[in-house]
Structures are given as C-alpha cells and as structure tokens.
Curated annotation (Swiss-Prot):
Catalyzes the addition of meso-diaminopimelic acid to the nucleotide precursor UDP-N-acetylmuramoyl-L-alanyl-D-glutamate (UMAG) in the biosynthesis of bacterial cell-wall peptidoglycan. Carboxylation is probably crucial for Mg(2+) binding and, consequently, for the gamma-phosphate positioning of ATP. Keywords: ATP-binding, Cell cycle, Cell division, Cell shape, Cell wall biogenesis/degradation, Cytoplasm, Ligase, Magnesium, Nucleotide-binding, Peptidoglycan synthesis. Gene3D superfamilies: Mur ligase, C-terminal domain, Mur-like, catalytic domain, MurE/MurF, N-terminal domain. Meso-2,6-diaminopimelate binds at residues 389, 413-416, 462, 466. It comes from Neisseria meningitidis serogroup B (strain ATCC BAA-335 / MC58). It comes from the Bacteria. It is found in: Cytoplasm. Belongs to the MurCDEF family. MurE subfamily. It catalyses: UDP-N-acetyl-alpha-D-muramoyl-L-alanyl-D-glutamate + meso-2,6-diaminopimelate + ATP = UDP-N-acetyl-alpha-D-muramoyl-L-alanyl-gamma-D-glutamyl-meso-2,6-diaminopimelate + ADP + phosphate + H(+). Its EC number is 6.3.2.13. This is UDP-N-acetylmuramoyl-L-alanyl-D-glutamate--2,6-diaminopimelate ligase.
Length: 492
C-alpha cells in the first residue's frame, strides 16, 4: 500500500501519458463526467468502473485511466486517449494527486480517526481555524465543503479520486486547511492514498464495523495506519482509551521523528483535563498543556466532549497557534449537527438528538445526560440498531440503554434490507422491561415526547444529522430533528 505521494518510480505507476491535464477534473463515477473530464475506471466495492467506460466517453471524457489486470482489453471503438495502469484500485488516489499537481502538499491537512468523535472534532477544528485566520474545508460524515455550506455525502471518507478532486476544488476556492474524517473503511480501501497529512488525531477504539473488519484487532490495526503515514508531523492520541495508550507507546518507539501528544483525564497525558464541571448550560475545564495552562467554558455537553476539546487544543497548538487564542476560539464553537443537539421548549422535556450508534457512544451520551438531569426527573432513551450490520452489537446497545436510562424505547434505525422486527428481537433480550417497543421510529419518538414529564430528558440516539431512513434499499425522507420539533409543537 502506498500511503503518501511518492515519486512515480517508487509507486510503480508509469509516467502518465495524460497531456494537458491542468484544469480538468477527474471522476470515478461516469455520471459525473462532463466534456473534457478524465475518467478513472477500476474495480470498486459494488461495481467495476471499467464497465462504464462507454458511458464516460459518451458524456465527454477526454481521457481514461483504466485498471490493467491482464484480462481487460481496451476497445478501439472507444476513441479517446487512454492509459492502463496495474492495480489502479489501490493507486487511484496517488494517480489523481499527481494529475492535480499534489494539491494536498499546499494545504494543512488534518486527519481524524477513531470510532467516535470524528465529526465533532473535524467541525470544531474547522470553526476554530477559521476564527484563527485560516480558510478551512471539511471532509466528513455530515458533508464536504466549508463550515455552514456543506454538501451532503454518502460516505464519511469519499472514494480516492473524489478525495483528490475535493482537495483540488478546495484549493481553488482559497482553502488553507482541510479537516478530514478518516474512516477505517477509507484506510482499508486506499481512499486517502496520495493525501499529505500534516497532523492526525486518534479519538478511541470501541466496537463497530465488525461485520466488515471481523475482529477488534483487525479494526485497530487499520485505524493505526494513519499514524504511520509518511510525512506526518503530529500525532494526537487519547490515552484515556486503552488502545490509544498502547498506540502512544508504539509510536514513540517506532517513529522517533514524529511529535506525539497524548490527551485525556489521565495524569500522564501531555494535554491533561482537570477541574471538569458539567451542567445543562455546558462544560468547563482547565487544560494543562506543554504550551501553558488555561480554562475553557463551552455550551457543549459531556465529559467526552472535554476530551474532544483537548484533542483540538493539542492539534492547533502543535500547528503553531497560541494557546490563549485557541482557548478563546474554542469557547465560541457550535456543536456539529445531530451531535448532542439540544431542542428546548419552555415547559416541555429537553430532547437531545445524537448520532450515538455504538454501545460506547450510547453509554457516554446517557451518562452525560444523567449528570445534568433534574432531581426526580427521568432520562428516556429512544434507539434502534442498523440493519445488515454487526448483529453482535445489538444486545450490547440494549444493555447500554438499560444501564444508562430510566426508561427505554426500542425502535428502528436504518433497517436496510432486514425486517425491523428481527432487529428489535435481537435487542430485546438485553432490555427486559422496555417502556415501549415500536418499530415505527417516528411513532416511537412521538410516544416519548408525549409521555415524558416536563422536566424529563429524552435522548433520541442513532441517526443524528441524517435526513433519511433506509428501508429495503430505499432512502425515505426522515429526520429525527424534524420529528422532534413537530412532536414538541403538538404536545399538550
């Protein structure tokens, strides 16, 4: 695997025969091709891009790079210049980077990896960097683009050619920084090959995606690849996480030229969180760092968000921004959409919409809300589990809900191609006395809002910012935030 842009001879990619590429866009989806664009055709996760060469040519492709596996042959009827490259599936990002002129070399690219927290941290880094004088682009789950103007996306980390095209466009639009969520799928499928990462954050490693990775060991090994990236200058690691603490030790041994910064509540952390306080108004903490000590108070909720703030402080200070200014701008940041998103109406329950879809994330979200729950009030949890994903996670989610909430409503998430009732039945053994079982998620949300007391807190977990529900392969319009708003309006 080639993680970082290297000379052509070292990557094994031959000298590119694509002339006059400057200004052209590359795409691996033939439907995006416009007159003069370049098509990159290689086998993908679900389809073989080489099957779509005729469509790309019909749409105006001026050049085609294609995966030369020794079996596929170029059809002379496709009368456009072309070049076959071996193992293009894993080299597409490097190829695109070279065609675009290595644009990520001219950006401060910050990567964020880990099971939970990637979206919040990338969006906070973008907001903070903008306030510090940068122009920061975002690549991640909620969308790609600039803060306040994100375009929806289907993948946390896009396809390799799309990643490079995004970076090229961002640079054209004046970006100086790119904050990127780096998923385990993205690392495993070579989607970020060719990206010059300057700094990287590791948030945590908890159970997720085992339907894909198989074991936690394999999952962790893939996550750690980002921190061995050629040219990486700073690694920022959560040492409150067991895997993170181990990773710090390995990196200090294996990468003597890498600046490694640990963060967390641990007394051994380089960026240590102390004097933490939490209320319904937000959190505050003192951060002891190699650059000095300071306090930050924000409207964010949760102990885990203090850890996320520490990660941001470490990365920003490592990149040369003064600690006092970093703390000042972080106090002004807004939560990412669907991440501990509070909907408050006077005389009605506080409803919090969060993307928590792993046992660890659900446990932490509920613990946060228990801390701020009024005396005598109840904490509700409305959640489900995604279909066609790790079945072993379902009872663990149920157990986390029972442990952390006073009242549990079990419902659907994105059932995908599974029967919603089958998914619920996998959850229920861990939820012996649910308040309600309702497969219709909208009805489940309305039930909780209608039945909760005025001083109760309701966590709607799992979908966060998503504006759809995937049922039998069809994405129907659905938003937890919208359903909650409507339910609060009609509550008597």
């Amino acid at each position: 695997m080639f993680s970082k842009l290297t000379p052509l001879a070292e990557t094994g990619i031959p000298t590119l025969s694509c002339a006059n590429a400057a200004g052209r866009l590359l795409h691996s989806d033939s439907r995006q091709i416009k007159q003069g664009d370049i098509f990159v055709a290689c086998p993908g996760e679900y389809a073989d891009g080489r099957s779509y060469i005729p469509a790309a040519v019909a749409n105006g492709a001026a050049f085609v790079f294609w995966d030369d596996d020794g079996k596929f042959a170029w059809n002379p009827e496709w009368k456009v210049p072309n070049q076959g490259i071996k193992d293009l599936k894993h080299r597409a990002g490097i190829l695109a980077a070279q065609v675009y002129g290595n644009v990520s070399d001219g950006l401060k690219v910050w990567g964020v990896a880990g099971t939970n927290g990637k979206t919040s941290i990338t969006q906070w880094l973008a907001q903070a960097a903008d306030l510090l004088g940068e122009k920061t682009a975002i690549v991640g789950t909620v969308g790609n683009g600039f803060w306040g103007a994100l375009e929806e996306t289907t993948h946390t980390t896009p396809a390799p050619v799309d990643v490079q095209t995004l970076l090229y466009r961002f640079r054209q639009q004046g970006a100086t920084v790119a904050a990127m969520e780096v998923s385990s799928h993205g690392l495993d499928q070579s989607r970020v090959n060719g990206v010059s990462f300057r700094s990287a954050i590791f948030t945590n490693l908890t159970r997720d995606h085992l339907d894909y990775h198989g074991t936690m060991e394999a999952y962790g090994a893939i996550k750690s690849r980002l921190f061995y990236w050629h040219g990486l200058k700073h690694a920022v690691i959560n040492v409150d996480d067991e895997y993170g603490a181990e990773l710090v030790g390995r990196l200090k041994k294996d990468c003597p030229d890498l600046a490694v910064y640990s963060y967390g509540f641990s007394e051994h952390a380089d960026i240590r969180i102390t004097d933490f306080t939490a209320s319904s108004d937000g959190i505050a903490a003192v951060f002891q760092t190699p650059w000095g000590e300071g306090k930050c108070r924000t409207r964010l909720l949760g102990r885990f968000n203090a850890q996320n703030l520490a990660a941001c402080i470490a990365l920003l200070c490592a990149n040369g921004y003064p600690l006092d200014k970093v703390l000042d701008v972080l106090a002004k940041i807004r939560p990412a959409s669907g991440r501990m998103d509070c909907i408050m109406n006077s005389g009605k329950p506080l409803v919090v919409v969060d993307y928590a879809h792993t046992p660890d994330a659900l446990e932490k979200a509920l613990a946060t809300l228990q801390e701020i729950k009024p005396q005598g009030a109840a904490l509700w949890c409305v959640f489900g589990c995604g279909g066609n994903r790790d079945r072993g996670k379902r009872p663990l989610m149920g157990a986390a809900a029972v442990q952390g909430a006073d009242k549990v409503v079990v419902t659907s998430d994105n059932p995908r191609l599974e029967n919603p009732h089958d998914i619920i039945n996998d959850i229920l053994p861990a939820v012996p006395a649910p308040e309600c079982v309702e497969a219709d998620r909208a009805a489940a949300v309305r039930y909780a809002v209608e039945q909760a007391a005025a001083n109760d807190i309701i966590l709607i977990a799992g979908k966060g910012h998503e504006n759809y529900q995937d049922v039998q392969g069809v994405k129907h319009r659905f938003s937890d935030l919208e359903i909650v708003g409507q339910a609060l309006l009609t509550r008597k």
